[in-house]
Curated annotation (Swiss-Prot):
Belongs to the TIFA family. This is TRAF-interacting protein with FHA domain-containing protein A. The gene is Tifa. One of its GO terms (biological process) is tumor necrosis factor-mediated signaling pathway. Keywords: Cytoplasm, Immunity, Innate immunity, Phosphoprotein.
């Protein structure tokens, strides 16, 4: 006989909310395999992969410009912390991944901030982590943005990430446009 007092305490679960945008999202069905607005639960030992290969990735993009495995998110627990954190690893040999203003090349990884902008090709992801108590599992939730996220969230404008992954130093080292006097031309 189970009573209310004997019932297990329900723990809240860490949720990684991902708002995504691609300029061709309405015409091409790029995100047709992603369930928007509903939460999906994963065990905390699972590495969640994103890419175009449905046999290897939990989340797939219907786009030949995306690598078979584009990037991976792995939960972990920081030393002396009671909540889950995430690290992101670029799995693409041909395209760099931008996390805020940090460029990740092939197999580079970093800890994911609580809120950050992730970009590759023409894809834009706004990732936001909501802490939970459980370290046994976590959830993901996708939201489709009707507008580019860089402008909508007042993030600094950045040059698009070229598909060959090679950046021009002109774009990566300049943070704002330079003003010139017309006599300097």
């Amino acid at each position: 006989m189970s009573t209310f007092e004997d019932a297990d305490t329900e723990e809240t679960v860490t949720c990684l909310q991902m708002t995504i945008y691609h300029p061709g999202q309405l015409q091409s069905g790029i995100f047709k395999s992603i369930r928007f607005c509903s939460k999906e639960k994963f065990p905390s030992i699972e590495v969640v992969k994103f890419g175009r290969n449905s046999n290897m990735c939990q989340y797939t993009f219907q786009d030949k410009q995306v690598s078979r495995v584009q990037f991976a998110l792995q939960p972990f627990k920081q030393f002396n912390s009671s909540v889950l954190s995430f690290e992101i690893k670029n799995m693409s040999k041909k395209t760099s991944l931008m996390v805020d203003n940090q460029e990740l090349g092939y197999l580079n990884k970093m800890d994911l901030p609580y809120k950050c902008m992730l970009r590759f090709g023409e894809y834009q992801f706004l990732l936001q982590k909501e802490d939970g108590e459980s370290v046994e599992s976590f959830e993901t939730q996708f939201i489709l943005s009707p507008r580019p996220l860089l402008q909508e969230n007042n993030w600094p404008t950045q040059s698009p990430i070229p598909e060959d992954g090679v950046y021009s130093s002109y774009f990566t080292h300049r943070s704002s446009p330079a003003e010139m006097d017309e006599n300097e031309l």
